[in-house]
Amino acid sequence: MYGIDNYPKNYHASGIGLVNLAALGYSKNEVSGGNEGGGAPKPKAGLYPSLPYPSSESVGGMPYVVKQTSHAQNASYAGPTMGMGMPVPEAPSAPAPYPSATPYPGSGLYPSLPSANVSSLPYPTAPMAPYPTGMPYPTGMPQPNLPYPAAPLAPYPSAMPGLPGMPMPYAPMPTSPAPQHNIGFPALPYPTAPPPESAPTQEEEPSVGVAELSFTSVKVPENQNMFWMGRKATSARQNSVSKGDFQSLRDSCLANGTMFEDPDFPATNASLMYSRRPDRYYEWLRPGDIADDPQFFVEGYSRFDVQQGELGDCWLLAAAANLTQDSTLFFRVIPPDQDFQENYAGIFHFKFWQYGKWVEVVIDDRLPTYNGELIYMHSTEKNEFWSALLEKAYAKLHGSYEALKGGTTCEAMEDFTGGVTEWYDIKEAPPNLFSIMMKAAERGSMMGCSLEPDPHVLEAETPQGLIRGHAYSITKVCLMDISTPNRQGKLPMIRMRNPWGNDAEWSGPWSDSSPEWRFIPEHTKEEIGLNFDRDGEFWMSFQDFLNHFDRVEICNLSPDSLTEDQQHSSRRKWEMSMFEGEWTSGVTAGGCRNFLETFWHNPQYIISLEDPDDEDDDGKCTAIVALMQKNRRSKRNVGIDCLTIGFAIYHLTDRDMQVKPQGLNFFKYRASVARSPHFINTREVCARFKLPPGHYLIVPSTFDPNEEGEFIIRVFSETRNNMEENDDEVGFGETDDRIAPSLPPPTPKEEDDPQRIALRRLFDSVAGSDEEVDWQELKRILDHSMRDVMVGSDGFSKDAVRSMVAMLDKDRSGRLGFEEFEALLTDIAKWRAVFKLYDTRRTGSIDGFHLRGALNSAGYHLNNRLLNALAHRYGSREGQIPFDDFLMCAIKVRTFIEMFRERDTDNSDTAFFNLDDWLERTIYS
């Protein structure tokens, strides 16, 4: 198969295929929509049937996976084409055989977390559904042979189809043409002679036509997940008092003798839920109306202050319980400068990490109650309110309490710390998992765990007292001294807590009052604070933990998590790099590698790993890559859920480093050296890799093209790393040679030249006696002469023609003289030729994915941020840009670059304007 690197799409990577997670994160007494008074409804049996993984037994029999999505997909094949409707070149006469494929682990959300070696990168392992059409599949699949592709190359043909004069590395082909699979995204035709997107790499690293196994995506039910840097509001509603206003607001209330009432999160039903009206009346009360002698803290704080109410946010409570284990982190999130005695004005504030920065959230202290009792998170002490107010602040951050229904512990742990969370499927865990957890505990990492839910029973209880589909916090990991008649030594042990805070505890060995405790010395019991209260906390041996739990989450603390003192301490710390980005439909939302023709349009980032890990002998670097989408949970009230996201990693040679960004040809002939194990619709996708020192390209994407969203991408390493965006530099470039035949010859300067006489006659016919052309006169000329490219249009808009005049009107008279008129027509002829080169379907519009190439051909280079801005400004909902809007793009780009260059006299990329000057120039343009 030629040039296709498909990424499979699954719907929940739990290690056992696809399972029903509808029960995850609900409280025991929760009332869910449509089932009033009866608790959360039970999901239908088989709602999320198991989906096996690809087979490692016979790659030749590797079948195709039909992507299951909410919209219809065409799973047919369409003849000998190679993806997106591009023709498949003739196969070489003696194709090289495909090497065998490596297996993909059949379970685990992040199977590569145990420091997968890139030389043995995992690929899919269990049988999948057969090809829907019965089409034969090539008898072998190419293996990237990581870290460097090594499949033999056929001789270079003189040129590739559609790329005249551009010699390309040609990959071995199967003797039968590879079928095209239509995956629901329309073919995007390129110009008849498209510009080379990137030069082929011809160094010591072979280039091969890669046909990797498909990536899958993981679909988590909507009620469980959902969620650039600080430039937009962090919740669905605009918060006027959310950031930095606490002190001034409190002082104002104290001066006026009033109690604070938050206008952004009012005490109404809208702050409780968005999907329906409450089934009963809830009264919002201040702590003084709920309990006598209200306190922020009662005898300090502890994990036992976190008790779950009716809201299905056990994931949040598990993280809050973990937060109490570290006083530094705790008081960063919950500032201690507030209580119900001194300077009390009914106002409190909390701080959460949001996409690279710490955000202060200010709330009033009115809490929802029923019959005078708190209905959501609360403390065991009736007059203690820090936990209830913390939950309210987090609900405000995301728009409502209902927005907190369902989630993963790692999401809240990251918002409390700024760290990055790794997931381990315990059934596929590395043999050193306990050591990993011990080291994580020593670094102050937060940890949680859970059991897979029962697909038929909501929050089913196991015979040992554990709750399925429920989040537990891990509060201690240790080696415990044990002395029995048969054994003396240390036993790996784990302490966990159920946020329900009741008697729903583990009842097996080492449970409360278990006889095993008699073998533990008394001093050890005192050291670990052993008690047997019915408080939801219990101990387990590590072996029982492996046998009964399914997933563990470890939140590694980042530099964002640490105070200045901690950053200068001797404790080992991660090195971190972070960038923000955006997927814009038709421009930078290219979809995954399954969509080869658009994949290269995604944002690209280069990470340079310089030194191997200090304590390892393998000469490799640990890298944790975390891709997080932004502001999705807060938009659940308007039907916006998490996108299905993932990433791929490619090795770069020194020559590759000169190309910015990498184009279609790079990805057509290169295999990824690492990638996210799945595309999944959770807020963050994270994986750990072991890579040789070098340069790597990371391409984050959504699974399907044209899905819009914002994201941040972070890379953590044990040694220093350098990260940069692999993007074009803004400025002028060379005009595409291919448009030269379409351009009129330069107008001779001799006054008696026939061409100049004709142009002068045209100008005089519209200019009149004043010898100048205004925008109305220019519009009449252009509307008549540009009919062939203004398909279905009534002509140029007033704004477009005025901008053309302003571009060349140096004296700002609103009119053009003959020389300016002549220069404008020359520019328009160039832009028209470029547009026709890319409007291959002759529809009068170009696809947004071609905007970068079209502007490059016109001599203008822009980065992704500017392309996104142009697409938002001039693109249609379908991602199309008509001719007059393309001209506006070119005019704006040229005008503002020239305006900047005029003031940047020393080429320092810095220009100075006073306000009057800047407004005059921008308003007139």
From Swiss-Prot:
Residues 723-753 are annotated as: Disordered. Keywords: Autocatalytic cleavage, Calcium, Cytoplasm, Hydrolase, Membrane, Metal-binding, Protease, Repeat, Thiol protease. Gene3D superfamilies: 2.60.120.380, Cysteine proteinases (3.90.70.10), EF-hand (1.10.238.10). GO terms for molecular function: calcium ion binding; calcium-dependent cysteine-type endopeptidase activity. GO terms for biological process: border follicle cell migration; neuron remodeling; protein autoprocessing; proteolysis. Ca(2+) 1 binds at D809, D811, S813, R815, E820. Its main location: cytoplasm. GO terms for cellular component: cytoplasm; membrane. Residues 259-558 form the Calpain catalytic domain. The keyword Hydrolase applies. Activated by millimolar concentrations of calcium. The keyword Hydrolase applies. Calcium-regulated non-lysosomal thiol-protease. PANTHER family: CALPAIN, CALPAIN-A-RELATED. Belongs to the peptidase C2 family. This is Calpain-B. It comes from Drosophila melanogaster (Fruit fly). The gene is CalpB.
